[in-house]
């Protein structure tokens, strides 16, 4: 049975004081109401250690928004998975649309990260999704297929148990727009089918992978989204950055 996951992406928001306050609030509130859902938060890199210490021993998982695909080395400005392990972080987000759009991260670059992380016993949250222009030109499925096939190329089947996917329609992020549950379900179903075609035997593996929806998820739409067969949770931006709205997602 697939896990239902509510993952909060704090992006480059919140001061240290705000992040610490939110982490304490989450520790106090979320474990008691999460029930059968898995809760995750992805603070900014500078706040990871503080938030990890606060949530240590709770059911809330702390993840990193990014890292580099290397051990300790001369890559100025980057963060190594080795450094993340030192502070107890074992989940990393890869391929978020903002990193693709503004920092030029390609499917192949994402693939380098994913393969390195999985081989080093991390769980990866891999983000895929189309822009407004790609959607309007009818290229949604083509774009997603490339992101899945190129981003997950060469990954051994044994590692797929540590893989989570998130579909984030770029046109819906931070705009207040949201795909209808049926529109989101159609794309999630396609993603699952694409995974099932990656290699022989992938069909059963694809059924076990959680696929989150990540387009302006809020308390007033999360329940309708979760009713769909292939939507297994949410990758949440703004609504995860206040304890009141984050708690309502559970």
Curated annotation (Swiss-Prot):
Official protein name in the record: Triosephosphate isomerase
EC assignment: 5.3.1.1
Positions annotated to bind substrate: 9-11, 174, 216, 237-238
Keyword Cytoplasm: yes
Record note on quaternary structure: Homodimer.
SUPFAM superfamilies with a match to the protein in the record: Triosephosphate isomerase (TIM)
Disulfide bonds: none
Location in or out of the cell: Cytoplasm
Active site: 96, 168
Keywords per UniProt: Cytoplasm, Gluconeogenesis, Glycolysis, Isomerase
GO CC annotations, alphabetized: cytosol
Gene Ontology biological process terms, A to Z: gluconeogenesis; glyceraldehyde-3-phosphate biosynthetic process; glycerol catabolic process; glycolytic process
Pathway(s): Carbohydrate biosynthesis; gluconeogenesis; Carbohydrate degradation; glycolysis; D-glyceraldehyde 3-phosphate from glycerone phosphate: step 1/1
Entry keyword Isomerase: yes
Gene3D superfamilies: Aldolase class I (3.20.20.70)
Originating organism: Leptospira interrogans serogroup Icterohaemorrhagiae serovar Lai (strain 56601)
